[in-house]
């Protein structure tokens, strides 16, 4: 098994890492408005959450360049079954200005930590939109987003946005990434298929999906 424990957060398969805030800041213009080569999904979830993602290989490369320069894959390489390199499946912005109630869910379910999510804020003021998560004992705790720091999590990490409201939308940079072996793709795709209109598979090929809230996010044991 490739699972690990964060003793500080008292939760499994989650870590916090430093990130280069100057690279993260490159995405501020995209957060402020739409641009050619991008598309959006609005899953609801007790909020006005928007996933703004690349719709072409060229715009995907913008996120991939940041992913590589930030060396995000290095933090989880030891847990992945790799042939050559850590693969970025999707990069996008998570944008919201209100959330009325928690929506606990899992990003990854029974993938044996072959896929991970990274989240980091684009600005220092997240207006209370922090990350709620469930500890191993079932208690709900809060992780406060910090500029220059990212949270990375894998399998069975139950979490939600903390309810809040902001006059100006708050944006997070998100990467979803993991193994470059196709043998794991079926379980990975079962979770993320539909979150973005385009995904890059472990083998490097691009594929189109139908935008919708990923069905894996509604796993019954997500809380």
Predicted regions and their residues:
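Double-stranded beta-helix
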Residues: 175-216, 221
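Non-heme Fe(II)/2-oxoglutarate
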Residues: 1-80
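Intrinsically disordered, low-complexity, compositionally biased regions/tails
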Residues: 17, 37, 41, 48, ...
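Short, charged low-complexity intrinsically disordered segments located at boundaries
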Residues: 59-63, 102-109, 204-206
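Short, surface-exposed loop and linker segments with low hydrophobicity and enrichment for Pro/Ser/Thr
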Residues: 61, 168-169
């Amino acid at each position: 098994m490739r699972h690990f424990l964060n003793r500080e957060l008292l939760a499994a398969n989650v870590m916090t890492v430093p990130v280069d805030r100057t690279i993260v800041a490159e995405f501020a213009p995209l957060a402020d408005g739409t641009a050619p080569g991008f598309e959006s999904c609005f899953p609801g979830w007790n909020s006005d959450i928007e996933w703004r993602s690349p719709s072409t290989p060229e715009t995907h490369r913008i996120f991939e360049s940041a992913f590589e320069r930030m060396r995000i894959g290095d933090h989880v390489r030891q847990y992945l079954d790799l042939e050559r390199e850590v693969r970025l499946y999707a990069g996008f912005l998570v944008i919201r200005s209100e959330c009325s109630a928690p929506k606990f869910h899992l990003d990854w379910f029974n993938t044996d930590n072959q896929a991970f999510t990274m989240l980091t804020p684009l600005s220092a003021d997240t207006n209370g939109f922090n990350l709620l998560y469930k500890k191993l004992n079932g208690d709900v705790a809060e992780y406060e987003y910090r500029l220059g720091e990212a949270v990375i999590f894998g399998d069975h990490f139950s979490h939600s946005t903390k309810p809040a409201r902001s006059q100006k939308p708050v944006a997070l940079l998100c990467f979803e990434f993991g193994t470059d072996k196709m043998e794991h793709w079926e379980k990975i795709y079962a979770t993320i298929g539909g979150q973005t209109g385009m995904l890059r598979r472990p083998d490097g090929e691009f594929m189109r999906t139908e935008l919708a809230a990923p069905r894996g996010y509604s796993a019954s044991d997500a809380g």
